[in-house]
């Protein structure tokens, strides 16, 4: 299905690009989320009329993400979890746990933004983690996983 992108989407394209995606991806995710519209003549004309408005909105979203990126870059977030004597955790530290720690530090984040390329953290230590606040704004933070004291 051919669609018009209403915002920049990583790995797909920029605002205004006409791209071909699988029908299910367009119908079930992109169109309902307001990230794209079908590439019909009427929608293309409507997009051209609203282009400046959409570009301004995207610039504002990116500027907000850059501000949050500057606050987050280089920060250390501590997460306490029960651990054995050998340093292995009982359970694991997931992206939801890290997002909750970031929010507790006073910076807006959701678990979908936290990138754990090697999966959940399963041992005590310090880990470099990326927080993708926007396609063009990725902050690198240090997550210190410590053994919880009771």
UniProtKB/Swiss-Prot annotation:
The keyword rRNA processing does not apply. Keywords: Ribonucleoprotein, Ribosomal protein, RNA-binding, rRNA-binding. GO terms for cellular component: ribonucleoprotein complex; ribosome. InterPro entries: Ribosomal_bL9 (IPR000244), Ribosomal_bL9/RNase_H1_N (IPR009027), Ribosomal_bL9_bac/chp (IPR020594), Ribosomal_bL9_C (IPR020069), Ribosomal_bL9_C_sf (IPR036791), Ribosomal_bL9_N (IPR020070), Ribosomal_bL9_N_sf (IPR036935). GO terms for biological process: translation. SUPFAM superfamilies: L9 N-domain-like (SSF55658), Ribosomal protein L9 C-domain (SSF55653). GO terms for molecular function: rRNA binding; structural constituent of ribosome. The keyword rRNA-binding applies. Binds to the 23S rRNA. HAMAP family: Ribosomal_bL9 (MF_00503). Belongs to the bacterial ribosomal protein bL9 family. PANTHER family: 50S RIBOSOMAL PROTEIN L9. This is Large ribosomal subunit protein bL9. It comes from Neisseria meningitidis serogroup C / serotype 2a (strain ATCC 700532 / DSM 15464 / FAM18). The lineage of its organism: Bacteria, Pseudomonadati, Pseudomonadota, Betaproteobacteria, Neisseriales.
